[in-house]
């Protein structure tokens, strides 16, 4: 019997995919063009069908050489996922992980949905916020191909006749990460420069609003700059990203410190850091990302979610000051927070008008409720998050929830997660209001609100007692009167005790006596 010889070449499949990726970058042997909002991405049908169930079903039903994706898909997100299909790696800015997850869910890429969700949870946890970008992990500044340099692959030695076309794919108006890249790159350069101690690493340059405006001018997006702001992620690999705990505000701090009687501060809440000033362009760019939420309910119409009725909010959060007479934000508040709120709040309108909190989420809140949230919060983004969550979730809902929109509580499986669409819409709205607002802080605040709600609900279970002389006409008082006689001096003692309890500080609260 003839012997069988076997030979194995390690990583041959990876080498083939690497060559296919280089061919894609050069536009060679590509048999399909995927159009995303006017941007054409050349690719190979076999690779897309092997990576995505969405493309596999699409190619089975259509042989067209041009495929156009729905408007909900963003070009930058598809570019990153297309790169993943060829390399198995994702490269993204911190904070864009939700957008990547929703894009992968729409394209039905199970690997990103399963492994990526677990990885992004680790990135968003407070324990991972302290992991910084070490000097030896700083991105290389060697010239590479426009897209391959984000993946860490060597540049192709063959000429790239379609480099200009690939570059145009990066010139996106909807996603601009140059300011963040510049800030994080300066941070890593300071750490690599051997700054003495923690003080040196924390003293990072602040960029004012004019600097951001200059960096946001339409220009080709340099991927060498963009890689400084992203953590190149191998699925299932280790975390390596810029330190989020050492980030500073890119704008000058502006605390809302009005001492007038109409001050919009709420002293009952903790002091919060001042937010950053933004522009309408920023809001429109971020709203472009929010359209991805419509893909949470693929194949069906997303259910419309509205805030709680005003009276319910007042019952659960009596400290919220309602000002129904306001048709637009006060000028004094606008001077402090700038253009970081919902665009329609700057124009006069009906207080009962329902506004979509974030474009594409189908999450609605009335103009009056949203305005009250901003008026109560002022410049404090954490208070704004609490106000918005209280507008959508009543106390009982918070008490029976675990504070996240991802999974049930590990301590008590009966506590279900909050509505993920509402939770993420509120989070992204607050991130637009304060770009330095970390998701780990938001999760901690939501969990804290659920804990406080459980405490309040638990206190409400305690029975409220009444003095015997206040309970008249009921069976219990008649039973007492039939079985025993209440002495006049004892009644006078109870009456004097009640008076002292209302006037003194050590007596029972008025709520218990009522």
Swiss-Prot record:
InterPro entries for the chain: BEN_domain, BTB/POZ_dom, SKP1/BTB/POZ_sf, ZnFinger_BTB_dom_contain
Phenotype of gene-disrupted mutants: Mice are viable with no obvious developmental or physiological impairments. In addition, they do not display alterations in chronic responses to cocaine and amphetamine administration, but do however display significantly diminished acute behavioral and neurochemical responses to these drugs.
Residue pairs linked by disulfide bridges in the UniProt entry: none
Compositional bias annotation for Acidic residues: 267-279
Gene Ontology annotations for the cellular component aspect, listed alphabetically: cell junction; cytoplasm; nucleoplasm; nucleus
Alphabetized Pfam families for the sequence: BEN, BTB
Compositionally skewed regions (Low complexity) per UniProt: 252-264
Modified residue annotations for Phosphoserine: 187, 245, 492, 496
Limits of the BEN domain: 360-457
CDD domains to which the protein is assigned, alphabetical: BTB_POZ_BTBD14B_NAC1 (cd18290)
Region called Disordered, residue ranges: 183-205, 242-279
Subunit architecture: Homooligomer; mediated by the BTB domain. Interacts with HDAC3 and HDAC4. Interacts (via BTB domain) with CUL3, PSMD7 and RCOR1.
Functional summary from the UniProt entry: Functions as a transcriptional repressor. Seems to function as a transcriptional corepressor in neuronal cells through recruitment of HDAC3 and HDAC4. Contributes to tumor progression, and tumor cell proliferation and survival. This may be mediated at least in part through repressing transcriptional activity of GADD45GIP1. Required for recruiting the proteasome from the nucleus to the cytoplasm and dendritic spines. Involved in the acute behavioral and neurological responses to cocaine and amphetamines.
Protein name, UniProt field: Nucleus accumbens-associated protein 1
Encoding gene (name): Nacc1
């Amino acid at each position: 019997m003839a012997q069988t010889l076997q030979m194995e070449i390690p990583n041959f499949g990876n080498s083939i995919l690497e060559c296919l990726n280089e061919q894609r970058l050069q536009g060679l042997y590509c048999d399909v063009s995927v159009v995303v909002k006017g941007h054409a991405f050349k690719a190979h049908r076999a690779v897309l069908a092997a990576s995505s169930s969405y493309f596999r079903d699409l190619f089975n039903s259509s042989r067209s050489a041009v495929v156009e994706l729905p408007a909900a898909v963003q070009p930058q997100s598809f570019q990153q996922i297309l790169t993943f299909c060829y390399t198995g790696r994702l490269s993204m800015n911190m904070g864009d992980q939700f957008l990547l997850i929703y894009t992968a869910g729409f394209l039905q890429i199970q690997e990103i949905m399963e492994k990526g969700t677990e990885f992004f949870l680790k990135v968003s946890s407070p324990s991972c916020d302290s992991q910084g970008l070490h000097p030896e992990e700083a991105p290389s500044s060697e010239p590479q191909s426009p897209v391959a340099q984000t993946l860490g692959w060597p540049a192709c030695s063959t000429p790239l006749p379609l480099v200009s076309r690939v570059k145009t794919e990066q010139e996106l108006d909807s996603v601009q990460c140059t300011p963040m890249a510049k800030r994080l790159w300066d941070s890593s350069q300071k750490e690599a420069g051997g700054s003495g101690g923690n003080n040196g690493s924390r003293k990072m340059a602040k960029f004012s609003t004019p600097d951001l405006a200059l960096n946001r001018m339409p220009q080709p997006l340099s991927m060498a700059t963009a890689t400084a702001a992203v953590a190149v992620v191998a699925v299932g690999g280790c975390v390596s990203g810029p330190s989020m705990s050492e980030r500073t505000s890119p704008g000058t701090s502006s605390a809302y410190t009005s001492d007038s009687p109409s001050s919009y501060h709420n002293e009952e809440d903790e002091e919060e850091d001042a937010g950053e000033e933004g522009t309408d362009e920023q809001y429109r760019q971020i709203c472009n990302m929010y359209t991805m939420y419509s893909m949470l309910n693929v194949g069906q119409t997303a259910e419309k979610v509205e805030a709680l009725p005003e009276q319910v909010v007042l019952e659960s959060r009596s400290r919220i000051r309602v000002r129904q007479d306001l048709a637009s934000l006060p000028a004094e508040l606008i001077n402090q927070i700038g253009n970081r709120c919902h665009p329609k709040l700057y124009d006069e309108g009906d207080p009962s008008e329902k506004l979509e909190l974030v474009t594409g989420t189908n999450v609605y809140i009335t103009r009056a409720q949203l305005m009250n949230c901003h008026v109560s919060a002022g410049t404090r983004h954490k208070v704004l998050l609490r106000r918005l969550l209280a507008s959508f979730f009543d106390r009982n809902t918070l008490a029976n929830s675990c504070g996240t929109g991802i999974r049930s509580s590990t301590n008590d499986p009966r506590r279900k997660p909050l509505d993920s669409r509402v939770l993420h819409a509120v989070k992204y709205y607050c991130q637009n209001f304060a770009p330095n607002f970390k998701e780990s802080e938001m999760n901690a605040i939501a969990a804290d609100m659920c804990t406080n709600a459980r405490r309040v609900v638990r206190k409400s279970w305690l029975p409220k007692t009444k003095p015997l002389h206040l309970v008249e006409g009921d069976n219990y008082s008649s039973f007492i009167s039939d079985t025993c006689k209440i002495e006049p001096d004892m009644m006078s003692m109870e009456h004097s005790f009640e008076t002292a309890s209302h006037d003194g500080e050590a007596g029972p609260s008025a709520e218990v006596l009522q």
